[in-house]
Amino acid sequence: MCDLFYQLPRNVLAIFSGRNLLWYASAVILTIIIVTSGGDWAYYRWTRVGAFFELARPALALGMFMPVLWPLAVLVAGLASKNRRLITTAWALGQAAFLAYLITTCNKAITGRRPPPFHGHAGMLGQNGPALVDSSHGFQFGFLRGGIFWGWPSGHTTVAFSMALCLIMLYRRSKVVVLFGLLYAFYIGLAVSVTIHWFSEFTAGAIIGSVIGMTVGRSFRTKLLSSRFPGGKACKNFDEQQ
């Protein structure tokens, strides 16, 4: 059975309620601080060099295709081995990616933030550095005034952190999973912050994505527990068996 939409309405409500609203507010406030203090522009001037761009380039493709390929690979592995846990993990990752993309797209459609200049042309910064004008304040609030590709928060970052934190919530006792998840999320996020996004878009995406991933992860973790132990009985050895 497809569990991609398992408790979806409840999870959406959870993302935008209680403490999670405070985290969302912190993403907004942190963005305002970084932008108004000149942090975005300073970070942009410091990081737009060839070496950073070359290291970050693979993340642009990874961040675009992994949200689809990763859940599919886990799902195929789970179906092939008839492993219910892997199948549930695949649906959890899929929902985390879906919600992160949906929420990010809605935010971008409203905030309409202009992207950093010279996308993919890091070498031009050194040649024209003195003539550059700070464009980090370029928000176009409204609806679809800046499209849904560029903008606040970073979609690559939000989806990466959402999937990573979802996986960590499901396998939180596994040091390998925790390390892999965090490395993946930070690589994607930092990579886009030195190429196609402002630094504040990375920070906001990391916060919002973490909230989404933890919410979805908790939801599917409950599903795993209930299916593993009918009747809702807890098992102290569950985490140890991860």
Listing of model-derived features with the role each one plays in the protein:
Residues 30-37, 100-105, 183-193:
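Aromatic-anchored segments of alpha-helical transmembrane domains
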Residues 1-74, 108-143, 236, 240-241:
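N-terminal transmembrane-helix/juxtamembrane module of multi-pass inner/ER membrane proteins
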Residues 36-37, 100-101, 105, 109, ...:
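Transmembrane alpha-helical segments of multi-pass membrane transport proteins and ion-pumping complexes
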Residues 128-242:
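Membrane-embedded catalytic cores of phosphoryl/pyrophosphoryl-handling enzymes
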Residues 24, 28-29, 93-101, 105, ...:
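Alpha-helical transmembrane spans of integral membrane proteins, capturing the lipid-embedded, hydrophobic core
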Residues 8-9, 37, 75-85, 170-173, ...:
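Structural signal for the C-terminal ends of transmembrane alpha-helices
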Residues 24-26, 90-94, 177-182, 203:
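Hydrophobic alpha-helical transmembrane segments
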Residues 77-109:
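Interfacial segments of alpha-helical transmembrane regions
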